[in-house]
Every structure is written in structure tokens, then in C-alpha cells.
Curated annotation (Swiss-Prot):
It catalyses: 1-(5-phospho-beta-D-ribosyl)-5-[(5-phospho-beta-D-ribosylamino)methylideneamino]imidazole-4-carboxamide = 5-[(5-phospho-1-deoxy-D-ribulos-1-ylimino)methylamino]-1-(5-phospho-beta-D-ribosyl)imidazole-4-carboxamide. Its main location: cytoplasm. The active site is at 8 (proton acceptor), 130 (proton donor). Pathway: Amino-acid biosynthesis; L-histidine biosynthesis; L-histidine from 5-phospho-alpha-D-ribose 1-diphosphate: step 4/9. One of its GO terms (cellular component) is cytoplasm. Belongs to the HisA/HisF family. It is found in: Cytoplasm. This is 1-(5-phosphoribosyl)-5-[(5-phosphoribosylamino)methylideneamino] imidazole-4-carboxamide isomerase. It holds the Pfam family His_biosynth. It is an enzyme of class 5 (isomerase). Keywords: Amino-acid biosynthesis, Cytoplasm, Histidine biosynthesis, Isomerase.
Length: 256
């Protein structure tokens, strides 16, 4: 089970939202690259980076911030947020991003998926499905899609998509556990590779996720729980990794 720390960028800074609500925003560090270095020092093998400004506007507002992270790190980035054109996909992959996540555009412009897959391998393109009660939400979770989450997944699979980042919106940022049943159901019904997202809070949640590997859930994106130092091993890293030279006394991190 691959654990992928999340970095959300808004106005150039590293933030976390609660259930995607921009009015419930918490700033953790001014420089997202510093946050990326911290997660790499804590043995991250991949990072999930989202340009929240781009998700709102469609403009790649934080492109240079993301490019800096790519340059500084030796692990792949998975990048999402407002990717609505072939040009946006190309710009990210050209700077060395490992794979891009296409969300709302997969619903509003499915032809983009076909266009992108004519040029890039499926391993480079991921579709993000954010669902509430089994119904995909798009455009910053403000609109509902006219199909079930698994129906959208199967449509993307037919086009050639192999992996989905599946987020249970009701759990995202709530620190109350992840959507076990919804994630299991989606993975079972689509037979796709699934990266779970939203609500993982504890080691117990991770152990439950391991039980879903048989259905194709092989990785998980974790945000707020890592930032709030919910995992005991993080204290060890903070206390003994003296070469982490960044001021990471953000939030409730318990660095002595």
C-alpha cells in the first residue's frame, strides 16, 4: 500500500481544506516546496499536489511552485487541479511530473481523455472521481454528475484509463475515518486500479485499506492526518531527523 502525502496549493501557500470548502482553509507553510521536502525526508515515495487556484479558475496559477517541487525532489509528483486541456497536460508532463489527474474535464469534456491517451501512456493519466453518496461531483464539488460513480469509472476504463483517484467527499478533511464501503464498492464494480482519498485518519484506517488491496486499491492519499501528526512514527522522524532544516512547527506537529 503506497502512502502518498498531499500538498494543496492556494495563493502560493500550502493549505488544507475541510470537505473542499475554501472558507475552511488552514495554512500550514508559506512555501509548498518546503512541505514537499519534509514529506520526502519522511520517506514519501510519491506526492499528490493540487493547484487549488487552477481548480477554481482553470488557469495554472501555481505552475512555477509545482515546477520548483519537481526540480527539488527525486520522487514523482501526481498533479491535479484545473487540468482541462491537452496543453495543460503537456506542460506538466514536459517539466517531469509523473502523472496528471483529470477531474471535472473527464465529465464535461470526455473527448479530452481520448485525445490525451492518443499521445501519452495510460500510466501518465489518472482520472479523479470525487463522489458523495455514489454521485460524482464536479467544478469544485458544486455540481452533480448525471451518472453513478462506478458508471463514470467504467466509461473512463472503456476509453483506456487504468487508474482512478477516488475521493469520498463526505469524509475528506473531516478526520473521522475514510469511506471504506464506498471505496470498496467502486473498486469492485469497476475492476480498476484505485488510489483512495479522503478521511484516512489513523493506522487503523490504513490496516482497513490493506484489506481492499484484493479489489485493486493499492495506494492512498493522506492530507490532514499527516499534517496534524496523527501517526506515531512522525514524532520519531521529527525528533531524530536533524537534517530536516526547515521550520516545520506548523499546526499541531509535536516536534520537541
Amino acid at each position: 500500500m503506497l502512502i502518498i502525502p498531499a500538498i494543496d496549493i492556494k495563493d502560493g501557500r500550502c493549505v488544507r481544506l475541510t470537505r473542499g470548502d475554501f472558507n475552511q482553509q488552514k495554512i500550514y507553510l508559506d512555501n509548498p516546496c518546503d512541505m514537499a521536502i519534509i514529506w520526502r525526508k519522511q520517506n514519501a515515495k510519491m506526492l499528490h499536489v493540487v493547484d487549488l487556484d487552477a481548480a477554481l479558475t482553470g488557469e495554472m496559477v501555481n505552475f512555477l511552485k509545482i515546477e520548483q517541487i519537481v526540480r527539488e525532489l527525486d520522487i514523482p509528483l501526481q498533479v491535479g487541479g484545473g487540468i482541462r486541456s491537452l496543453d495543460a497536460v503537456k506542460r506538466y508532463l514536459d517539466i517531469g511530473v509523473g502523472r496528471v489527474v483529470i477531474g471535472s474535464a473527464a465529465v464535461t469534456n470526455p473527448g479530452l481523455i481520448e485525445e490525451v491517451l492518443k499521445i501519452y501512456r495510460p500510466s501518465k493519466i489518472v482520472v479523479g472521481i470525487d463522489a458523495e453518496n455514489g454521485i460524482p461531483k464536479i467544478k469544485g464539488w458544486t455540481e452533480s454528475c448525471g451518472m453513478k460513480d462506478y458508471e463514470l469509472g467504467l466509461e473512463m476504463k472503456q476509453m483506456g484509463i487504468e487508474r482512478v483517484v477516488y475521493t469520498d467527499i463526505s469524509k475528506d478533511g473531516m478526520m473521522q475515518g475514510f469511506g471504506y464501503e464506498s471505496t470498496k464498492r467502486f473498486a469492485e464494480m469497476t475492476g480498476m486500479k484505485v488510489t483512495a482519498s479522503g478521511g484516512v485518519t489513523s493506522s487503523d484506517d490504513l490496516m482497513k485499506l490493506v484489506g481492499l488491496q484484493q479489489y485493486g486499491v493499492d495506494s492512498v492519499i493522506i492530507g490532514k492526518a499527516l499534517y496534524e501528526c496523527n501517526f506515531p512514527c512522525q514524532e520519531l522522524w521529527y525528533n531524530f531527523e536533524e537534517d530536516i532544516c526547515i521550520d516545520h512547527n506548523f499546526s499541531t506537529a509535536r516536534k520537541k
